[in-house]
C-alpha cells in the first residue's frame, strides 16, 4: 500500500514538473519573453509589413520578402533560430506586439513619444523617412499649399494623417493597409495618396505606376523609424540594439537599400559614417 502511494505521488510530481517545463517553453506562434526563451522555442517571430514594397511585400509565391524581412532574417541568424514572419498593418502592429503575437516589430514604425510609452523602442533607430504624396502627372500640383480642400487617400493609423489635414487643409480618406488606398487612387476616389516617401518611391519602380504618377512635392515631416519589443524584454532589446549598431558599422542597411532599388537615404549614409569606425 505504501509502495503504491509513493509510486502514485512520484508519478504525480513528475507529471507536474513536465507540465511546468512545457509551459516554460513558448510554443510556435506565441511571443517569447527574452532571448533564452526564443532560443528554447527555436523561432524568432517578427511582425513585418506585407503590402509595403520594397520594405515588406509578397512575391508571386506568397512569401513575404523585402528590406525589413532581410533585417529580421539577419537577427534570426544571429540567434541561431528559425524565422517566422507575421504580416501586420499600421493599425494593428503595436497591438500584435502587446498581445504577444510577435517578439519584435520591424514594420515601418515611425518613432513617436506616444509609441515609446507603450512599447520598448530599439535605439538607435534603424531608418528614417519623409512623408510625400503620390499624384497623377496630370494633377498640376507642385506645392503642398495646393492640397487645401483636396481629397487624399491615406492609410489608417499613419501618424501624419492629422498633421497633413491640419497644416495643409487636405481631406483625408483613410483605408486599412496600402493596397486599398492605392486602388482608390486609381479609381479616382482621391487626388493622391499620402504615405511614407520610400514606399511611394518603391511603387514608382513598377511600370504600372511610373507611367502616370509621380512625386512632384518635396518630402516633409522627416521621422526616424524604430524597431520595438515588448516593454520589459531587456535581453531581446539589448541583442537587437547591438545588431543595429553592427548594421550601421558595416553599411548593411545601405547595401539593403541598393539591393531593393532604393536610393540610400541621407540618414542611412550618416549613420554608417558615424558607426563605421566604432570599436564596440
Regions found by a protein language model. Give the residues of each.
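Ligand-binding clefts/hinges and TM-proximal coupling segments of bilobed small-molecule sensing domains
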Residues: 33, 160-175, 211-216, 244-280
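Bilobed "Venus flytrap"/periplasmic-binding protein-like clamshell domains
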Residues: 45-54, 64-77, 110, 130-180, ...
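Acidic, polar ligand-binding/catalytic clefts
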Residues: 73, 77, 82-146, 211-213, ...
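Alpha-to-beta junction loops
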Residues: 44-45, 80-82, 99-107, 150-151, ...
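Extracytoplasmic small-molecule ligand-binding "clamshell" domains
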Residues: 31-108
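Short helix-initiation/N-cap motifs at beta->coil->alpha
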Residues: 69, 84-95, 157-159, 173-187, ...
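Periplasmic-binding protein-like
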Residues: 127-135, 197, 201, 205-244, ...
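Extended ligand-binding regions for polar small-molecule ligands
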Residues: 70-78, 138-141, 145-146, 150-151, ...
Amino acid at each position: 500500500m505504501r509502495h503504491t502511494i509513493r509510486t502514485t505521488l512520484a508519478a504525480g510530481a513528475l507529471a507536474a514538473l513536465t507540465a511546468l517545463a512545457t509551459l516554460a517553453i513558448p510554443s510556435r506562434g506565441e511571443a517569447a519573453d527574452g532571448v533564452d526563451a526564443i532560443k528554447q522555442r527555436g523561432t524568432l517571430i517578427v511582425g513585418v509589413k506585407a503590402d509595403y514594397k520594397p520594405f515588406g511585400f509578397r512575391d508571386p509565391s506568397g512569401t513575404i520578402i523585402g528590406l525589413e524581412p532581410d533585417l529580421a532574417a539577419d537577427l534570426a541568424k544571429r540567434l541561431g533560430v528559425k524565422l517566422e514572419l507575421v504580416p501586420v498593418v499600421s493599425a494593428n502592429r503595436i497591438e500584435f506586439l502587446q498581445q504577444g503575437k510577435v517578439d519584435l516589430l520591424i514594420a515601418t514604425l515611425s518613432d513617436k513619444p506616444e509609441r515609446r510609452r507603450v512599447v520598448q523602442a530599439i535605439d538607435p533607430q534603424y531608418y528614417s523617412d519623409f512623408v510625400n504624396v503620390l499624384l497623377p502627372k496630370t494633377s498640376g500640383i507642385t506645392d503642398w499649399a495646393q492640397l487645401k480642400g483636396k481629397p487624399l487617400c491615406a492609410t489608417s493609423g499613419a501618424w501624419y494623417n492629422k498633421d497633413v489635414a491640419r497644416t495643409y487643409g487636405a481631406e483625408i480618406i483613410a483605408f486599412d493597409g496600402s493596397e486599398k488606398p492605392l486602388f482608390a487612387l486609381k479609381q479616382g476616389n482621391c487626388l493622391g495618396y499620402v504615405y511614407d516617401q520610400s514606399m511611394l518611391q518603391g511603387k514608382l519602380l513598377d511600370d504600372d505606376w511610373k507611367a502616370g504618377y509621380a512625386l512632384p512635392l518635396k518630402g516633409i515631416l522627416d521621422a526616424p523609424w524604430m524597431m520595438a519589443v515588448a516593454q520589459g524584454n531587456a535581453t531581446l532589446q539589448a541583442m537587437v540594439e547591438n545588431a543595429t549598431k553592427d548594421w550601421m558599422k558595416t553599411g548593411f542597411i545601405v547595401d539593403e537599400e541598393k539591393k531593393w532599388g532604393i536610393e540610400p537615404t541621407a540618414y542611412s549614409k550618416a549613420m554608417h559614417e558615424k558607426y563605421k569606425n566604432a570599436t564596440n
